[in-house]
Amino acid sequence: MDGIKYAVFTDKSIRLLGNNQYTSNVESGSTRTEIKHWVELFFGVKVIAMNSHRLPGKGRRMGPIMGHTMHYRRMIITLQPGYSIPPLRKKRT
């Protein structure tokens, strides 16, 4: 399982870093317990809470045909005080 796809750097996610909360996009088929176990195992941290929501795909037009991009899942991971995750690579657009 790959777990985390990439870190998310928005105004809200940068503000949440002050509360020891990290935001990232994950595989849409993964569950909270899988991601929690993967984060604790890979980074060696203690997770106390996980919030997730699924973001819808955007509409894309190719000539007369209307399509859409895939939806994805975003997790906000809260760590115990004293733990931190090193910065993840930002997705290149």
UniProtKB/Swiss-Prot annotation:
GO BP annotations listed: translation
Superkingdom assignment:
Eukaryota
Identify the keywords attached in UniProt to this record, alphabetized: Chloroplast, Plastid, Ribonucleoprotein, Ribosomal protein, RNA-binding, rRNA-binding
One of the Pfam families matching this protein, by short name: Ribosomal_L23
Cross-referenced InterPro entries: Nucleotide-bd_a/b_plait_sf (IPR012677), Ribosomal_uL23-like (IPR013025), Ribosomal_uL23/eL15/eS24_sf (IPR012678), Ribosomal_uL23_CS (IPR001014)
GO CC annotation: chloroplast; ribonucleoprotein complex; ribosome
Keyword Thylakoid in annotation: no
Subcellular location, record wording: Plastid, Chloroplast
Main localization category = plastid
- What Gene Ontology molecular function terms does this protein carry? rRNA binding; structural constituent of ribosome
Cite the HAMAP family for this sequence: Ribosomal_uL23_B
Q: How does it assemble?
A: Part of the 50S ribosomal subunit.
Per the entry, what this protein does is: Binds to 23S rRNA.
| UniProt similarity note | Belongs to the universal ribosomal protein uL23 family.
Name of the protein:
Large ribosomal subunit protein uL23cz/uL23cy
